[in-house]
Amino acid sequence: MKTIKLLILAFVAFTPFTGCAPEDDIKNSNLSPYLFYEEFLSVKEETEGDPLDILGWTNFAQAGTVKWNQGFYSGTKYAEFTSYQSNEPSNIAWLISPPINMDLLENEKLAFDVAQAYVSSSSNSIELLYSTNYDGTNVTAATWIPLTFTKPPLDYDTNFDFFSSGKIDLSDKDIFTGNINLAFRCKGSGTNFSLDGTYEIDNIRIFNEK
């Protein structure tokens, strides 16, 4: 991660915080308990920066060696991808959820929190995808279908700030039936300064909206 982050974080530490957590944006009295929730509680401060290793999840480097890492700052735990200083021309990393049974609820919505830092090109990307035929092993052999979500603004002033993805509709039972896997795929480059930005995700949740 770029050293300038330390300067920004030091400034933030002495700046009053007036916003609310992104996950608060979707909370209301019409939500039932979660079908799926991942907030990366297994992340530890002392292993910050190490590859994520969470039971049931797949952390896969398709190009290069960079995987999704453990992120920790000021008590907040999250998953992080960055190509910074990888020294590899191409980095493609997947973080894939365990199977999620979509037959247990109706009117499902998906939401998560997402942050970026130093991202300046659409080629330095984060994608959300799902699969109904991922076998838990062969990532590239599965069929992955993209889902649209609200991406964080690419502003210097909001580097490392989490934003809500918005609510993503998973309620169509002709599409989302049986087990599905969610995937977060990031692309970057450690040899191209314009493609070595950072993405962070947290509070991934699927819930029933009554």
Report residues per predicted region.
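Bacterial N-terminal signal peptides that target proteins for export
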Residues: 1-7
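Extracellular beta-rich ligand/substrate-recognition surface
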Residues: 80-93, 155-162
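Terminal, low-complexity interaction segments
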Residues: 151-210
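Extracellular glycan-recognition surfaces and repeat-rich motifs
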Residues: 39-83
